[in-house]
Design a protein with these regions (language model features):
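Extended, hydrophobic alpha-helical segments in both membrane/secreted and soluble proteins
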Residues: 224, 351-353, 567-573, 581-591, ...
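Short, small/polar-rich motifs associated with maturation and membrane association
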Residues: 1-353, 358-359, 364-367, 371-373, ...
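Transmembrane beta-strand segments that form the barrel wall of outer-membrane beta-barrel proteins
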Residues: 265-267, 332-336, 583-592, 634, ...
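Glycine-rich, aromatic-lined ligand/substrate-binding cores of catalytic
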Residues: 852-885
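Short aromatic-centered micro-motifs
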Residues: 70, 100, 207, 401, ...
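Residues on the lipid-exposed face of transmembrane beta-strands in outer-membrane beta-barrel proteins
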Residues: 252, 282, 317-321, 351-357, ...
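Surface-exposed loop/interface segments of Gram-negative outer-membrane beta-barrel transport/assembly proteins
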Residues: 143, 257-298, 340-346, 350-434, ...
Length: 1009
């Protein structure tokens, strides 16, 4: 297929603004320096008689076109127009011909002649004015799309300090929630599309990078050309069991045919600090006797002792180009991100190479792509080890070190450890390596019929090792010496895919068909070992057998291997008539070894319709209306179970051990019951949408309304033993419903030669409801308490109940404090207010629903401004109508504890007369639930395109400064009201152990050569 058939096209209204942003981002369409191997040929060309031609490229309105390609036909000699549409090019001779092209306009050719000034006016190409979006196994003209699909191009990505690809589109796609909720440099974004649909299955959308399944962290953000989101089931059903949570399609940048070699560098440096810290007592308040602490005479800022101003630097270099028959691209990225907490970091090096070659008069195309990533991070799991918690609750009058240089500890207090010692008395290396190789062979024997064979292998290897010294708190408190561990894991996915597609247009008809086969084979294997009580800390993890725990049978050793194949047959037919009526049908038949013997296979169909009302004759008089299209779709998708052998009886050999007559023996125990009827969760979704554009597409948008029902939901049911071998069985029984509305509005309020303002607003609402938890065979209570807090509270904070949504807080409603300093709690049965007693904790007479953790409204607001060489963009996100459990307040806003306290403990709750006394134990009451509403300045970026004189090497430089998480408008008292909500069993809980979110300031540079 010719190169121009595959171009990503822009809508007319966004064309010039997108180009401005494209150029300011330093994306490479600029001329390149001469490669070393071409030096001799350049000398020869210079000796020939050359002609210089210059001029201005404009559109039909007389406005300059920025970034238009000016090429000397038949060569790689060329340039692009500047911000005034001007160009200058030296060509070989007067017989040369210039080819002028730009996306959205007809390509023109003009003879050079004697050179001089040649102004050019490009004409609109109406066939190119409709943007192309990526759908499953192909692309589609936006005007023909009948499903809920959102597309974000590179020029609209969020700039600044970007951790993974999800952050590029945060707040830009209605219904897609992206949150990190953590400052951990190794944390990935949590993504959820259209609510919670499963109790046991995953909630993250399927991510495909150039058609290959992968994670958002497996691709460099700088290398992404577009991100397309398949939101409804009619679009995602062609991916079957993997598409129930939606599909995110990432397309990377590649070289173009007959284009000059272009090179680009982009890099940034960033400084980060905690976005907010909690206000605890300092040493002076301790000396005033406001806690039970003994004054040790020091003044220690524990949080400062374990934190720093974190430095991040990121560098990306890419090169791309192409000849008549070959394209190539390569890029290299290095990134090191420090965490604000000491010894937390993320260091990564990623390389990518892609080459394509056409032969036999474009009948055959061969492509090879390789991605290699090396990742390294430290051994500190700051959240898991409670470093932040230990720092905020520790006595500020205690020292960090003893006089002998060891870390000061006070083991008389439970769960109380020196956070600096936790960091310094351990060492380790966590390395991972990811390799992805993909090959494609595309055969096009006749025009418009393509058959493609794709082979891919993805291998991820993790190699982790670590050591706790004899002074580490867990070893020291239990009278053990050093502890060492070592593990290696490898995850391999082999993928074979064959697709054949055909498209044809005649008269007013359009027809597209696709059939395909996919085979995916996954293998996971690894081993791990640990030992402790070492005579010396010298060897670290390098001599595992030296620890004496091995001789006592207390050392650990394990290995595992599991595999599973996934097979799919799929097809799709799309038909359109007269650019008015469109229909799309798809089906996938899929089989997996993960399911029971009776349900290995399932079928996932979909249908969607589109009616472009604005193209009807009766709409011809409405010149202000550019587009009005009604869409409707229905589809079935599935959720696949995580473990390979859940449908089988599984035995655990080696645990537990038992000791008999001086010898350790391995035991054998049952790990799971068989279930031959185990099958896919099934999600059925109906979506109706409306796309519109007015005023020459200066104002456009979409609205979608949907309802999604999940049936045969997986749940671990308690079963009797005997007759069962194990007390739990994974089975299909539950039902859940999600329904909502999504709105997106795009506008260009101002557009002149020197100034442009673009703005986008997204809004979404989703309502979740659990419909059932049982069936005729498996039954459980319609009310299940969960989301337990840790020691010493140890209470559930939420209740899952049929007929209600997930994330329902459930507990005691407090209304004040008694004169005895105890909570006053509402009795739900009598309505009376009673003083707190321990008997209330498990008595439903004193517990009630207190609010929900799932926001009712999600907002995103994105703005970009361009004034001459300056550009400014900012992004705001918000969530409204939900509750947050402030766990740090529940623990440290209390006068009975043996730890440090929040200063707010001095404030009388509910504006009353009394504060909590030392008699009131830590517990969960409604006082610790807060409104979570917020509006956050997620990112703001100011950029400047540096004017350059004509240069042989550097064509464009853009510098920018950026701030992330700059401020948050909220009434919430905790660190950050933006919850990651990755675990549906603990929604809306602001954990005391979490890694606090950070605020970052960035300076970046983009250079095109």
């Amino acid at each position: 297929m010719k190169t121009h058939d595959n171009r990503v096209l822009f809508s007319k209204a966004l064309l010039k603004a997108a180009t401005c942003l494209f150029l300011t981002a330093g994306a490479g369409m600029s001329p390149v320096f001469a490669l070393p191997g071409t030096a001799e040929s350049m000398k020869m060309e210079i000796t020939q008689q050359t002609v210089t031609v210059s001029g201005v490229v404009k559109d039909k309105k007389g406005e300059p076109i920025i970034g238009a390609n000016i090429m000397e036909k038949g060569t790689t000699n060329g340039t692009i127009t500047d911000f005034d549409g001007k160009y200058t090019l030296k060509v070989k001779s007067a017989q040369s011909v210039l080819t002028i092209s730009y996306i959205g306009y007809k390509t023109q050719e003009i003879p050079v002649g004697n050179g001089g000034k040649k102004d050019i006016t490009l004409q609109d190409d109406s066939e190119l004015m409709d943007e192309v979006v990526v759908i499953g196994y192909g692309t589609q003209r936006k005007g023909d799309v009948t499903s809920a699909v959102a597309s974000v191009k590179a020029e609209d990505f969020t700039a600044g300090k970007i951790g993974d690809a999800a952050e590029l589109i945060k707040g830009k796609v209605a219904g897609l929630t992206i949150a990190k909720g953590s400052g951990d440099p190794n944390a990935e974004s949590t993504i959820r599309l259209r609510g919670v649909i499963s109790l046991q299955g995953g909630s993250t959308p399927l991510v495909l990078v150039d058609g290959i399944e992968g994670g958002l962290g497996t691709v460099s953000p700088e290398n992404i050309a577009s991100i397309d989101v398949l939101k409804d089931a009619s679009a995602a059903a062609i991916y079957g069991t993997r598409g129930a949570n939606g599909v995110i399609l990432i397309t990377t940048k590649n070289g173009q045919r007959e284009s000059r070699t272009a090179a680009n560098y982009s890099g940034y440096m960033s400084l980060s600090k905690f976005g907010k810290t909690l206000d605890f007592y300092g040493a002076e308040e301790i000396r005033q006797g406001l806690t039970n602490y003994v004054d040790k005479g020091y003044d220690t800022d524990w949080l400062d002792a374990v934190s720093r101003t974190a430095f991040t630097h990121n560098h990306n270099f890419n090169i791309s180009g192409g000849s008549k028959n070959t394209t190539y691209s390569a890029d290299f990225t290095y990134r090191k991100e420090e965490g604000v907490l000491l010894e937390t970091y993320n260091e990564e090096m990623r390389m990518r190479f892609d080459v394509s070659h056409w032969m036999l008069n474009d009948m055959l195309k061969v492509n090879f792509n390789m991605v290699k990533t090396f990742h390294k991070n430290g051994p500190i799991d700051a959240a898991g080890l409670g470093i932040y918690r230990q720092a905020i609750m520790r006595n500020p009058t205690e020292p960090i070190w003893n006089e002998d240089g060891t870390f000061y500890e006070n083991f008389a207090v439970n769960y109380y450890y020196n956070p600096v010692g936790i960091i310094r008395e351990q060492d380790g290396k966590y390395n991972s390596e990811n390799t992805r190789m993909t090959g494609n062979i595309t055969f096009e024997p006749i025009k418009n019929w393509q058959t493609n064979l794709m082979l891919s292998r993805r291998v991820t290897s993790d190699h982790n090792r670590g050591y706790y010294t004899s002074e580490y708190f867990s070893q020291k408190s239990e009278n053990h010496t050093g502890y060492a561990y070592h593990s290696q894991n490898e995850y391999t996915t082999d993928n074979l895919e064959v697709t054949s597609k055909y498209n044809h247009t005649w008269n007013k008809h359009r027809f597209d068909a696709l059939v395909g086969y996919n085979y995916q084979y996954n293998v996971n294997e690894g081993f791990g070992a640990n030992n402790y009580d070492y005579p010396t800390d010298f060897y670290l993890w390098n001599n595992l057998g030296l620890g004496t725990a091995l001789k006592d049978g207390k050392a650990g050793m394990s290995s595992y291997k599991n595999d599973n194949p996934l097979i799919g047959f799929f097809g799709r037919v799309s038909y359109g008539y007269d650019n008015k009526y469109n229909v799309l049908l798809s089906v996938r038949r899929e089989g997996s070894s993960k399911f029971g013997e009776n349900n290995k296979w399932a079928t996932f169909p979909s249908v969607s319709l589109g009616w472009t009302i604005s193209n009807e004759k009766f709409m011809e008089g409405l010149t202000w209306l550019n587009n009005l299209k009604l869409r409707a779709g229905y589809g079935v998708t599935g959720v696949i179970v995580g473990d390979s052998y859940n449908s089988l009886t599984r035995y655990e050999y080696g645990s537990p051990y038992f000791y008999d007559n001086g010898v350790w023996h391995q035991g054998l125990s049952v790990k799971s019951n068989p279930n031959p009827d185990l099958k896919w969760e099934t999600s059925k979704e109906f979506n109706i949408g409306l796309d519109w554009a007015v005023l020459d597409e200066r104002l456009s948008g979409s609205i979608d309304v949907y309802q999604k029902k999940t049936s045969d939901m997986l749940y671990d049911f308690t079963v009797p033993t005997p007759p069962n071998l194990y007390n739990k069985t994974l089975a299909n029984a539950g039902k859940m419903r999600n329904q909502g509305i999504e709105i997106a509005v795009n506008a260009i309020p101002v557009r002149t030669k020197d100034f442009e303002w673009k703005t986008t607003v997204t809004a979404s609402h989703n309502a979740n409801k659990l419909l059932s938890l049982s069936n005729d065979l498996y039954e459980t209570s319609n009310q299940i308490d969960h989301a337990y807090l840790g020691e010493p509270i140890s209470l559930s904070t939420q209740r899952m109940e049929v007929g209600r949504s997930m994330g329902q807080f459930y507990g005691m409603k407090s209304v004040g404090v008694s004169e005895n300093g105890l909570w006053m709690v509402e009795n739900t049965k009598t309505g009376e207010i009673e003083e707190f007693t321990d008997n209330m904790l498990s008595n439903d007479d004193y517990r009630q629903y207190l609010g929900n953790a799932l926001p009712k409204l999600y907002l995103g607001w994105n703005n970009s401004f361009r004034y001459k060489n300056f550009d400014l963009s900012f992004q705001m996100t918000g969530q409204f109508g939900f509750k947050i459990l402030n766990e740090p307040r529940a623990y440290y806003e209390n006068n009975s504890i043996a730890y440090n306290r929040l200063k707010s403990v001095q404030k009388a709750p509910y504006g009353g007369q009394y504060t909590l006394s030392t008699a009131q134990k830590q517990t969960f009451v409604s006082y610790y639930l807060e409104d979570g509403d917020f509006l956050k300045m997620t990112n703001i970026t100011l950029g400047y395109n540096i004017p350059l004189k004509s240069s042989k090497f550097v064509k464009n430089i853009r510098a920018y400064v950026s701030a992330d998480n700059l401020f948050c408008i909220t009434g919430y008292d905790g660190l950050d009201p933006e919850m990651s909500n990755g675990d549906i069993w603990s929604l809306g809980i602001d954990w005391r152990d979490k890694y606090p979110s950070t605020r970052s300031f960035t300076f970046g540079l983009n250079v095109s050569f």
